[in-house]
């Protein structure tokens, strides 16, 4: 079992139940999935850029990403309907907790000039979205082997009903907010 999952089941559930004054154990907020998305805008002109993004995402997430396609043609962005423009991975279960553990304990401390994530990035239903400017903060990525620095979006979906519940859950996991 993942270290963070065991910690959640052993310590954090009881702490959250007391903090949020929840009576039913099934109402305690938990993380359901983590979605990683890497948009590669230049993939419309150079298809090899997408291969590098897919390889990086596979190293970071530990599973093969799905290539995302453009939903409609936009002349201003020079993309057509159905063209590959990025990749995404959805993590659940033990892989999700392993990734979250690596993100909190290894990757976030390696971000340059980091002063904490914004606590305003919740969507109103307890889900948190954030962006990373470079993929090299993850130890799986070898700096010498990457073709270019890419950013990514990370969305953490929870069962929390409000932003305050989601914020309490993320803080309990040790997420650094401003």
Swiss-Prot record:
<dbReference type="InterPro" id="IPR002132">
    <property type="entry name" value="Ribosomal_uL5"/>
</dbReference>
<protein>
    <recommendedName>
        <fullName>Large ribosomal subunit protein uL5</fullName>
    </recommendedName>
</protein>
<dbReference type="InterPro" id="IPR031309">
    <property type="entry name" value="Ribosomal_uL5_C"/>
</dbReference>
<dbReference type="InterPro" id="IPR022803">
    <property type="entry name" value="Ribosomal_uL5_dom_sf"/>
</dbReference>
<dbReference type="GO" id="GO:0019843">
    <property type="term" value="F:rRNA binding"/>
</dbReference>
<comment type="similarity">
    <text>Belongs to the universal ribosomal protein uL5 family.</text>
</comment>
<dbReference type="InterPro" id="IPR031310">
    <property type="entry name" value="Ribosomal_uL5_N"/>
</dbReference>
<keyword id="KW-0689">Ribosomal protein</keyword>
<keyword id="KW-0694">RNA-binding</keyword>
<dbReference type="GO" id="GO:0006412">
    <property type="term" value="P:translation"/>
</dbReference>
<dbReference type="GO" id="GO:0005840">
    <property type="term" value="C:ribosome"/>
</dbReference>
<dbReference type="InterPro" id="IPR020930">
    <property type="entry name" value="Ribosomal_uL5_bac-type"/>
</dbReference>
<dbReference type="GO" id="GO:1990904">
    <property type="term" value="C:ribonucleoprotein complex"/>
</dbReference>
<dbReference type="GO" id="GO:0003735">
    <property type="term" value="F:structural constituent of ribosome"/>
</dbReference>
<dbReference type="GO" id="GO:0000049">
    <property type="term" value="F:tRNA binding"/>
</dbReference>
<comment type="function">
    <text>This is one of the proteins that bind and probably mediate the attachment of the 5S RNA into the large ribosomal subunit, where it forms part of the central protuberance. In the 70S ribosome it contacts protein S13 of the 30S subunit (bridge B1b), connecting the 2 subunits; this bridge is implicated in subunit movement. Contacts the P site tRNA; the 5S rRNA and some of its associated proteins might help stabilize positioning of ribosome-bound tRNAs.</text>
</comment>
<keyword id="KW-0820">tRNA-binding</keyword>
<dbReference type="Pfam" id="PF00281">
    <property type="entry name" value="Ribosomal_L5"/>
</dbReference>
<keyword id="KW-0687">Ribonucleoprotein</keyword>
<keyword id="KW-0699">rRNA-binding</keyword>
<comment type="subunit">
    <text>Part of the 50S ribosomal subunit; part of the 5S rRNA/L5/L18/L25 subcomplex. Contacts the 5S rRNA and the P site tRNA. Forms a bridge to the 30S subunit in the 70S ribosome.</text>
</comment>
<dbReference type="InterPro" id="IPR020929">
    <property type="entry name" value="Ribosomal_uL5_CS"/>
</dbReference>
<dbReference type="Pfam" id="PF00673">
    <property type="entry name" value="Ribosomal_L5_C"/>
</dbReference>
């Amino acid at each position: 079992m993942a270290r963070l999952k065991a910690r959640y089941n052993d310590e954090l559930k009881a702490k959250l139940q007391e903090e949020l004054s929840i009576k039913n154990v099934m109402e305690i907020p938990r993380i359901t999935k983590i979605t990683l998305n890497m948009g590669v805008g230049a993939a419309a002109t150079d298809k090899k850029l997408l291969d590098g993004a897919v390889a990086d995402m596979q190293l970071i997430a530990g599973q093969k990403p799905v290539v995302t396609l453009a939903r409609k043609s936009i002349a201003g962005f020079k993309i057509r309907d159905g063209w590959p423009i990025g990749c995404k991975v959805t993590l659940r279960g033990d892989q999700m907790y392993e990734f979250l553990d690596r993100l909190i304990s290894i990757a976030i401390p390696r971000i340059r000039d980091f002063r904490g994530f914004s606590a305003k990035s919740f969507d109103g239903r307890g889900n948190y979205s954030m962006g990373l400017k470079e993929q090299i903060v993850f130890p799986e990525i070898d700096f010498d082997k990457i073709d270019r620095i890419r950013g990514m979006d990370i969305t953490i979906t929870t069962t929390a009903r409000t932003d305050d519940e989601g914020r309490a859950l993320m803080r309990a996991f040790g997420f650094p907010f401003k």
